[in-house]
Regions:
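A conserved FAD-binding loop/helix module that cradles the flavin
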Residues: 56, 481-503
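C-terminal segments that line or cap access tunnels to active or ligand-binding sites in enzymes
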Residues: 326-436
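Mid-domain catalytic core of redox enzymes
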Residues: 255-375, 470
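Rossmann-like flavin
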Residues: 99-206
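Helical element adjacent to the flavin cofactor pocket in flavoenzyme catalytic cores
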Residues: 212-265, 271
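N-terminal glycine-rich phosphate/pyrophosphate-binding loop and immediately adjacent elements
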Residues: 2-140
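A glycine-rich dinucleotide-binding beta-alpha-beta segment and adjacent secondary-structure elements
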Residues: 185, 189-202, 358-364, 421-485
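Active-site-proximal substrate-binding core of FAD-dependent oxidoreductases
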Residues: 259, 505-513
Length: 513
């Protein structure tokens, strides 16, 4: 029976980050993955002469060597993963109707705090002070988060009150409540709320801290994409893990997590046999793991209640298009465009609960930033929408293909109508992924690759402050989208690194007796 200091289940962003952190610390670590490639959602696939990015729109918290974000620091500087990529020059373009139901919005917002603020003032005269206050508070919140990390969450209350008073003031409020407190004009709020779909919860409930952190990181560091899709990122982490002495088994399914008489982890049962270990870092959804991989008697009642109280987050539907015209020929100059019927996030969230009413969409043209993303004279375009409920559960198997093709056609039509650009005649390759696809490939409940909703009671701040109670099964910790910081590549990587550090701390305590 092979024995390891730690076993990491699942080679998604969180699992790979955890595996690298453990190997970097010199621990004998095994990574097991049921597929034949790493990445989970962070991957790519080929159709014809096109290679499609599976999930990444743009990576947050990355930046450049001169303006590096924490995610880049972890992956490149600490883990030593050599990566080349492109900075996305604008944060986003948004095309929608304002929450007043009348005003048309079509705006491009640049990177950089000063440029972003100037552009907002051009779009909404008189909003400058509220935007400046937003970024000032955002900087304070980022600094507070970095301080918390530097002391492993053991913050000093007096120090927090002296140095981060606004962080404490806004910590328990939603995005919309803080925007109103900042006296931000309604139209400015509509534009500033554009990114809500990246966290998939409406701004009435979305934690201001979570949203502020994300927007500030995008604006301050810029968004980034790897040259060769997410597959380059995840295979790069895998190669570094192996170079640091780690073992990786692919086509290997973890079937059960094993426990001793003290209800502590003692091993993992796989389709290749049993692996002995005292520590498991699981890149999976706790609801699925508790239901299928862990004996019920070892799970504390609180963890069952917590998993049941949480709501599965957005379920992805993506149309992948390989076009036989270049982005320049088609006039596709914007990298990322948010196309919403309304800037009212509550209305859009509720519309996203059914197949028929969901009309929210984000387009990404990778060639607008990376000219070599596809063969010369071509471009790759993705259209993504999110379902806020398990709407696909009611689709009959015999209706599946027709349903997904009908929705894909509706999304293509919306793109063409909104931008006044015809793409249908130039579609060389098309693939459609539904929540069922996500269920199959990454084994997430309802196809929810975003983990659990970051609701007001279950926000990033709440999870971070309660880290000690999030992992009550001895020897088992969760990483990835369903972990402490929610969805997003950077958040998954952060969770993997953080949970690995906590595991290393547990190991040290065990060694010290």
């Amino acid at each position: 029976m092979p024995k390891y200091d730690a076993v990491v289940i699942g080679a998604g962003n969180g699992g790979l980050a955890a595996a690298c952190r453990m190997a970097l610390a010199g621990k004998k670590t095994l990574l097991v993955e049921r597929h034949n490639l790493p990445g989970g959602c962070a991957s790519s696939f080929r159709r014809g002469r096109f290679e499609f990015e599976t999930a990444l729109h743009e990576l947050c918290e990355w930046g450049t060597p001169e303006n590096s974000g924490n995610c880049r620091n972890t992956v490149v500087e600490e883990y030593g993963v050599p990566l080349k990529g492109c900075i996305v020059p604008e944060n986003f373009r948004v095309i929608t109707t304002a929450s007043d139901g009348k005003t048309h919005i079509d705006a491009v917002l640049p990177c950089g705090v000063e440029a972003f603020t100037d552009r907002m003032e051009e779009l909404v005269p008189g909003c400058r002070k509220s935007i400046e206050d937003f970024f000032a508070i955002g900087k304070e919140c980022l600094d507070a988060g970095n301080y918390s990390l530097s002391v492993n969450g053991k913050t000093d209350s007096k120090y927090m009150m002296e140095h981060f008073p606004n962080f404490l003031k806004v910590g328990s409020y939603s995005v919309n409540k803080v925007f109103k407190a900042l006296k931000m004009p309604a139209l400015a709020q509509d534009i500033m709320n554009t990114y809500w779909g990246y966290l998939a919860i409406d701004a009435d409930r979305l934690s201001y801290l979570q949203y502020s952190n994300m927007v500030n990181l995008y604006v301050r560091h810029g968004a980034w994409i790897p040259d060769k899709t997410s597959h380059e990122l995840t295979t790069g982490m895998l190669e570094r893990f192996r170079a640091m002495g780690g073992d990786a088994w692919f086509d290997c399914t973890a079937e059960q997590i094993l426990f001793d008489d003290n209800k502590a982890v003692c091993g993992v049962q796989t389709n290749r046999g049993v692996i002995e270990t005292k520590h498991v870092l699981c890149n999976g959804n706790p609801s699925m793991v508790y239901a299928t991989m862990v004996p019920p008697e070892v799970i504390p009642e609180r963890m069952i209640k917590l998993a049941n109280a949480r709501k599965h987050c957005a379920r992805m539907f993506v149309v992948y298009l390989g076009l036989d015209k270049s982005a320049e020929e088609l006039g596709l100059t914007d990298y990322s465009i948010f196309m919403q019927d309304s800037a009212d996030s509550v209305k859009e969230y509720n519309s996203g609960k059914t197949l028929e009413t969901n009309n929210n969409m984000v387009s990404v043209c990778y060639n607008a930033v990376n000219k070599n993303f596809s063969p010369p004279g071509t471009c790759v375009l993705s259209l993504t929408t999110l379902y806020m409920e398990d709407a696909w559960a009611d689709v009959k198997e015999e209706d599946y293909v027709a349903t997904k093709n009908r929705i894909a056609r509706r999304m293509i039509d919306k793109f063409e109508k909104t931008l006044g650009v015809e793409i249908t005649p130039y579609i060389e390759e098309i693939e459609v992924a539904t929540p069922w696809t996500m269920c199959r490939f990454v084994n997430t409940p309802q196809g929810s690759a975003y983990g659990y909703e970051l609701d007001d009671w279950d926000s990033m701040m709440a999870r971070m402050r309660m880290m000690g109670t999030e992992n009550q099964v001895k020897g088992l910790k969760f990483v990835g989208a369903a972990s402490i910081r929610g969805d997003g590549y950077n958040s998954a990587i952060f969770s993997g690194s953080t949970m690995a550090k906590l595991t290393l701390a547990d190991m040290k305590k065990e060694e010290e007796g």
